[in-house]
């Protein structure tokens, strides 16, 4: 018996040591055997970098991995967190579409072979993927605002079409929807079980990738939803400016911002040399390569762990990718410093922020319609909103990025309402320009709705030039 007990103790110790060894290897605290070129000793054709913690300096590969937003374990999020005496009243969600096939092809190279059919046996996978496809097949008679009715409800091409949503993109938004369901429906009961169509507001641009992303999130949020209760409105503008899109001053800011981008590119000799090398490899003029926006296609290769394209003269490589990605990061940094993009953002984001504030005010008055709002959009939609809110440290919108506005009511003081702003699950409320110092001089744990209302109705115009008091005057004034 004594020997048996000793054996069991030794066996337990051996198991513990094995677990510690694997854990240390996973967190890169002890070395793993590598080949001469630094790769894993296992033979692999393609290597996907896997940083565990954020590097101390800006790393283009790490930033690119964050941008890919590859589905993995359930993420930690702060949506739905509030003191117990607060009641959730309404939620307004802005998303960027999920992972997509490139919008541009690099001339004289083979397109990346990405399958855009939805297959349960292929990674990334989601438990609701097959059910999602089955439900989409039942939606052929869905009534959406024109021209959305002519778009496919899910991606289904063996070789993706340009700009098409991939299986990764669908899974990203199924995850988003399920996360929001767990928080807002199961925990906070935002919608009743017999919810009605007027309690949802759904809007998307006319691209299949945004409609399909919206449907994937909606299915994760409301599995097996009734098609008769779902109506997507079409938004012609990526800024979601509806009837307020004409804004001359906004266009002036954009032109000057594009000029700034051009001048920064000219100053980057590393970037120009890299474009020259890449153009020589694919045997086209440098100007033609630059116009093809090669980083768009290379990001698809990178996110899907597919080798970069080659020609008879060689291959585009990771060093080329790093140089272009590093320039993108530098461009974002300078963009925030020069403030031209900030002026563009204030005017570009005002219509959609004004709509959101109006909905929140109605909900605060007790209206029970449009309790859950979803805008399925693009990076060029979310980026101006983030900038206008003063979230200068926010990363550029990744695939399937989500920006959430929550409206809360204080049960102890029912006339008082508060807002929370969350970006990819992080609470950024007290980083916004309208609430960044509120907690310094107030004991209240939440940011008052009035702060956001005042910001949208007045302070956004003050930040532009101080003389305008409404959107029309600001758009037709002088300032850029």
Curated annotation (Swiss-Prot):
InterPro entries according to UniProt: His_Pase_clade-2, His_PPase_superfam, Histidine_acid_phosphatase
Glycan-modified residues: 194, 305, 354
EC numbers, comma separated: 3.1.3.-
UniProt keyword terms in alphabetical order: Glycoprotein, Golgi apparatus, Hydrolase, Membrane, Signal-anchor, Transmembrane, Transmembrane helix
Bilayer-spanning residue ranges: 7-27
Highest rank taxon of the organism: Eukaryota
Gene3D superfamilies: Phosphoglycerate mutase-like (3.40.50.1240)
Membrane protein topology class: Single-pass type II membrane protein
Location in the cell: Golgi apparatus membrane
Ranges per topology, Lumenal: 28-480
BP-aspect Gene Ontology terms: chondroitin sulfate proteoglycan biosynthetic process; glycosaminoglycan biosynthetic process; positive regulation of heparan sulfate proteoglycan biosynthetic process
Function noted in UniProt: Responsible for the 2-O-dephosphorylation of xylose in the glycosaminoglycan-protein linkage region of proteoglycans thereby regulating the amount of mature glycosaminoglycan (GAG) chains. Sulfated glycosaminoglycans (GAGs), including heparan sulfate and chondroitin sulfate, are synthesized on the so-called common GAG-protein linkage region (GlcUAbeta1-3Galbeta1-3Galbeta1-4Xylbeta1-O-Ser) of core proteins, which is formed by the stepwise addition of monosaccharide residues by the respective specific glycosyltransferases.
Membership in a protein family: Belongs to the histidine acid phosphatase family.
Record-given protein name: 2-phosphoxylose phosphatase 1
Taxon lineage: Eukaryota, Metazoa, Chordata, Craniata, Vertebrata
């Amino acid at each position: 018996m004594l020997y048996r007990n000793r054996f069991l103790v030794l066996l337990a110790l051996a198991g513990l040591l094995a677990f510690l060894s694997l854990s240390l290897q996973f967190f890169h605290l002890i070395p793993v055997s590598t080949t001469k070129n630094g790769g894993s000793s296992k033979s692999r054709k393609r290597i996907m970098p896997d940083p565990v913690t954020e590097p101390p300096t800006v790393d283009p590969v790490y930033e690119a991995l964050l941008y890919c937003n590859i589905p993995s374990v359930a993420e930690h999020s702060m949506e739905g967190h509030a003191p117990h005496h607060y009641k959730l009243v309404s939620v307004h969600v802005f998303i960027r579409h999920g992972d997509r096939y490139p919008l541009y092809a690099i001339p004289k190279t083979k397109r990346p072979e990405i399958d855009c059919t939805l297959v349960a046996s292929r990674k990334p996978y989601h438990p609701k993927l097959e059910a999602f496809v089955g439900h989409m097949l039942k939606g052929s008679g869905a009534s959406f605002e024109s021209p959305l009715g002519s778009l496919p409800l899910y991606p289904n091409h063996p070789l993706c079409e340009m700009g098409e949503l991939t299986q990764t993109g669908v899974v990203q938004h199924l995850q988003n929807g399920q996360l929001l369901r767990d928080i807002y429906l199961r925990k906070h009961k935002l919608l009743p079980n017999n919810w009605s169509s007027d309690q949802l507001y759904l809007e998307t641009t006319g691209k299949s990738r945004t409609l399909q992303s919206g449907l994937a999130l909606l299915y994760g949020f409301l599995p097996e939803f009734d098609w008769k209760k779902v109506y997507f409105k079409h938004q012609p503008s990526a800024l979601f400016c509806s009837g307020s899109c004409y804004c001359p001053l906004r266009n002036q800011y954009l032109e000057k911002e594009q000029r700034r981008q051009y001048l920064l590119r000219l100053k980057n000799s590393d970037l120009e040399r890299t474009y020259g090398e890449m153009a020589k490899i694919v045997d086209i003029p440098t100007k033609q390569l630059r116009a093809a926006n090669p980083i768009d296609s290379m990001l698809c290769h990178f996110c899907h762990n597919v080798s970069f394209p080659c020609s008879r003269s060689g291959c585009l490589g990771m060093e080329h990718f790093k140089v272009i990605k590093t320039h993108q990061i530098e461009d974002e940094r300078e963009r925030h410093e020069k403030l031209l993009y900030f002026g563009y953002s204030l005017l570009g984001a005002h219509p959609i922020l004004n709509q959101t504030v109006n909905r929140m005010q109605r909900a605060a008055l007790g209206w029970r319609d449009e309790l859950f709002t979803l805008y399925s959009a693009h990076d060029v939609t979310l980026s101006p909103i983030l900038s206008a809110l003063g979230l200068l440290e926010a990363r550029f919108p990744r695939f399937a990025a989500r920006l959430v506005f929550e409206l809360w009511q204080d049960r102890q003081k029912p006339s008082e309402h508060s807002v929370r702003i969350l970006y990819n699950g992080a609470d950024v409320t007290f980083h916004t320009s309208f609430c960044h110092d509120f907690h310094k001089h107030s004991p209240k744990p939440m940011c008052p709705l009035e702060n956001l209302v005042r910001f949208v109705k007045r302070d956004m115009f003050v930040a532009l030039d101080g003389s305008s008091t409404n959107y029309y005057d600001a758009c037709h004034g002088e300032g850029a």
